[in-house]
Amino acid sequence: MSLTVRVIAADKTVWDSAAEEVILPSTTGQLGILSGHAPLLSALDVGVMRVRPGKDWVSIALMGGFVEVENDEVVILVNGAERGDTIDREEARSTLSAAQARLDQSEQSEDKQERYEAQRDFKRARARLQASGEVVNI
């Protein structure tokens, strides 16, 4: 038995297919979902979702949102999402490097909003690079 998985962003449906397993970045840690999972509603953090439609895994960068699981249906509503196989790694590396520099600079700032935005941008850039298949150690 398999799951029906849908990843829906405001501007597009990123994934709509059957899957055997899903791993999501919840706000309290990684969340694994298999067929027969108990009903669930959970907040999602910025991070990488992994979905296994067969024997291979597909990575999707999620920009935060919510997941609802019920009767082997997994509906993921997100602020933004991007499949890892569509991400330009060079561009993602460059974006992460710039986000890291901005984060380092913001740590000296008194402006809480600036620090928050720098942290958010860093997490998003890191998730995109990880979803592309690159190992990120920062």
From Swiss-Prot:
Domain of life: Bacteria
One of the record's GO cellular component terms: plasma membrane-derived thylakoid membrane
Subcellular location: Cellular thylakoid membrane
Coiled coil location: none
Keywords: ATP synthesis, CF(1), Hydrogen ion transport, Ion transport, Membrane, Thylakoid, Transport
Ion transport found in the keyword field: yes
Database matches in InterPro entries: ATP_synth_F1_dsu/esu, ATP_synth_F1_dsu/esu_N, ATP_synth_F1_esu_C, ATPsynth_dsu/esu_N
Region (Disordered): 88-119
Biased composition annotated in UniProt, kind: Basic and acidic residues: 109-119
Topology of this chain in the membrane: Peripheral membrane protein
Sample GO molecular function, one term: proton-transporting ATP synthase activity, rotational mechanism
Subunit annotation: F-type ATPases have 2 components, CF(1) - the catalytic core - and CF(0) - the membrane proton channel. CF(1) has five subunits: alpha(3), beta(3), gamma(1), delta(1), epsilon(1). CF(0) has three main subunits: a, b and c.
HAMAP family in the cross-refs: ATP_synth_epsil_bac
Role: Produces ATP from ADP in the presence of a proton gradient across the membrane.
PANTHER family: ATP SYNTHASE DELTA/EPSILON CHAIN, ATP SYNTHASE EPSILON CHAIN, CHLOROPLASTIC
Family: Belongs to the ATPase epsilon chain family.
NCBIfam families attached to this UniProt entry: ATP_synt_epsi, PRK13442.1
Record-given protein name: ATP synthase epsilon chain
Gene: atpC
